């Protein structure tokens, strides 16, 4: 039939165009989908749509107040007035800067996260307003190697701030470098006034450094610019791995109570810009016993009197002090700016000065003698009547004895009285 014949070719052309369109669509879907997810003939259209709209996983989030670099594994939250540690820190962070913010307290578990910040190695918290660091504040940072708390006015540093519950023989702190420069609070914020407050502050820092075995792996410790007057006893007793110790720009007047004997790995000891006047033999002997140490002593007010003689002799022989040629006298006035290495015994007036121990002995002896004299006078005063009677008896006895002696002398001197006395005796 003509009608049927006329419809046949047009219908065939339509089917051909549909087939070509289907092939084009199949090619586009195959090109946009991953090679491993090419659909089979039995795949549904929904699967085609899902495979075509697949996207790569989103990048780790960065806290809004911070700058993050995943390539450098660094997060910087600097001068953002943060009041606490951001909660959404990315787990890849290795170097974290939280400086110049407004955090006043660092509570226990301040860095506890899920997943944990296991790769964090360097943490800088300097320049905040931290006043309190609680026990276990860094407990959930198993990879932490370097911690900087400088320029924070710490009034309460827990004895377990660097330890936490994991500070034991089997699990000491991983810290290798601890920076505590200028953490002393202002004078008006110290407890019990200025001097007592400084003593309490020194004890607080010492307690945190010697808490158990937490810091036995510490190799670098910086305590500069903290106004220390003395180093607390046993401050360094639990730090056997220490290689670098910075105590410059304090107010140290003596190292009498400090012991460096167990710091067998110590390489650098910085004591510049303190108030040291002389170093005693016990300290010099400890330094001499440390195989690799170098001690820096510049800018101290050395007093060049007889007490300096042993130190001068030691300086002339030792190689422990690299800057010894720059050490000069500050007192007395006539010795000002004289180099310590240029001094000899005649310059130090040793003949006119007694050893301090001998001076102390003489003072003590004088006090004892004065006390004995006072007690003796008090006893005499209380027994004055009896003493007066006793003295009268002695006087009478002496008088009788002298009268008898005088009588015998007169008889012996006159022969007539002698014969008379003999006849009388007969």
Curated annotation (Swiss-Prot):
Residues 383-426 are cytoplasmic. Residues 53-91 form the LRRNT domain. The gene is Tpbg. May function as an inhibitor of Wnt/beta-catenin signaling by indirectly interacting with LRP6 and blocking Wnt3a-dependent LRP6 internalization. Residues 1-31 form the signal peptide. LRR repeats lie at residues 92-113, 116-139, 141-163, 172-210, 215-238, 239-261, 262-281. Highly expressed in embryo and placenta. In adult, expressed only in brain and ovary. Not detected in kidney small intestine, heart, spleen, testis, liver, lung, thymus and stomach. This is Trophoblast glycoprotein. The C-terminus of LRR N-terminal cap (LRRNT) and LRR 1 are essential for the inhibition of the Wnt signaling pathway. GO terms for biological process: cell chemotaxis; dendrite arborization; mesenchymal cell migration; negative regulation of cell population proliferation; olfactory learning; positive regulation of chemotaxis; positive regulation of ERK1 and ERK2 cascade; positive regulation of phosphatidylinositol 3-kinase/protein kinase B signal transduction. Residues 32-361 are extracellular. InterPro entries: Cys-rich_flank_reg_C, Leu-rich_rpt, Leu-rich_rpt_typical-subtyp, LRR_dom_sf, LRRNT, Wnt_signaling_inhibitor. It comes from Mus musculus (Mouse). It is a single-pass type I membrane protein. Residues 289-352 form the LRRCT domain. It is found in: Cell membrane. Disulfide bonds join 62-68, 66-77, 304-329, 306-350. PROSITE patterns: LRR (PS51450).
């Amino acid at each position: 039939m003509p009608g049927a014949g006329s419809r046949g070719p047009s219908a065939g052309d339509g089917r051909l165009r549909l087939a070509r369109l289907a092939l084009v669509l199949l090619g586009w879907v195959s090109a946009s989908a991953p090679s491993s997810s090419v659909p089979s003939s039995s795949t549904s259209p929904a699967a085609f749509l899902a495979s075509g709209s697949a996207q790569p996983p989103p990048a780790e989030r960065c806290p809004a107040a911070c700058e993050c670099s995943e390539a450098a594994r660094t997060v910087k939250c600097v001068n953002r007035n943060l009041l606490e540690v951001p909660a959404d820190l990315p787990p890849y962070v290795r170097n974290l800067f939280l400086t110049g913010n407004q955090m006043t307290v660092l509570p226990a578990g301040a860095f506890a996260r899920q997943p944990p910040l296991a790769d964090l190695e360097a943490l800088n918290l300097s320049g905040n307003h931290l006043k309190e660091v609680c026990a276990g504040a860094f407990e959930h940072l198993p990879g932490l190697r370097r911690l900087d708390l400088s320029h924070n006015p710490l009034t309460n540093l827990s004895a377990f701030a660097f330890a936490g519950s994991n500070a034991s023989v089997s699990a000491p702190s991983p810290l290798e470098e601890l920076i505590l420069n200028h953490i002393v609070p202002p004078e008006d914020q110290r407890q019990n006034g200025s001097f007592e407050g400084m003593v309490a502050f020194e004890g607080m820092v010492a307690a945190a450094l010697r808490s158990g075995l937490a810091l036995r792996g510490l190799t670098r410790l910086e305590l500069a610019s903290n106004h220390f007057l003395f180093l607390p006893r046993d401050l360094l007793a639990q730090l056997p791995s220490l290689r670098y110790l910075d105590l410059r720009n304090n107010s140290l007047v003596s190292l009498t109570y400090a012991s460096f004997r167990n710091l067998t790995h110590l390489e650098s000891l910085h004591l510049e810009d303190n108030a040291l006047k002389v170093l005693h033999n016990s300290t010099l002997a400890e330094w001499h016993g440390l195989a690799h140490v170098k001690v820096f002593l510049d800018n101290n007010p050395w007093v060049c009197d007889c007490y300096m003689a042993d130190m001068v002799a030691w300086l002339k022989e030792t190689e422990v002090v690299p800057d010894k040629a720059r050490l000069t006298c500050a007192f007395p006035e006539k010795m000002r700016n004289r180099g310590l290495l240029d001094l000899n015994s005649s310059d130090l007036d040793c003949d006119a000065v007694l050893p301090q121990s001998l001076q102390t002995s003489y003072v003590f002896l004088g006090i004892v003698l004065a006390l004995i004299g006072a007690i003796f006078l008090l006893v005499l005063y209380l027994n004055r009547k009896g003493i007066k009677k006793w003295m009268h008896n002695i006087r009478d006895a002496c008088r009788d004895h002298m009268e008898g002696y005088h009588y015998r002398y007169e008889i012996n001197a006159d022969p007539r009285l002698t014969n008379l006395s003999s006849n009388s005796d007969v």
